Amino acid sequence: EQFPLKDTSVSTTINGVIAETYVTQTYTNEGQNPINASYVFPASARVTVHGMKMEIGDEVITAKIREKEEAKTEFEEAKSEGKSASLLEQQRPNVFTMNVANVMPGDTVRIELHYTELISSRDGVYQFVFPTVTGPRYASPSPENSGQDEWVASPYLEEGTAPQGTYDIAVNLSTGVPISSLTSSSHKIKVEKESESIAHVTLSDSGEFA
């Protein structure tokens, strides 16, 4: 069955060394049957997830924090009753997965994720990374965890390959100190500086790779 990613929108505000990010992604079940899907979101080990919301048609499902086993039980019950449901879990310090149950043919699923992240520096350079897909660096199975690594089979794009669907990202940056330079190693970007320490960064109109 086909469940392609149609659109990704990322809005990030960086104040000092804290980045607050809102991610919205849209998928559509283009198959002929109901499906259960697994959504994999790679992130740094310094990420804290604050909220997740899923919209399927007119139905809105908002995540609530539960003990792991209790959450799994509630998810399986909803799944067995044919209800749309989702379960967000942290599989590793840097990988979150969300299981989505009973997505009907033609349904469009909109997922909203809200998280904050501590930005670290290396040699005086601060780097913010938003991964478009999971890849080998995020999904390397280890022998001691081989029984828990089924999720690592998630497909990924080779370096330099454009992600599926439309993609845009906007970063509002307030550093508190003068910004010496702003660059992207992956994409061509457009930078608008409001002052020495405040800037707005978006992808260039072409969305080309750097």
Identify what each model region corresponds to.
Residues 1-210:
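Subset of Sec-pathway N-terminal targeting signals
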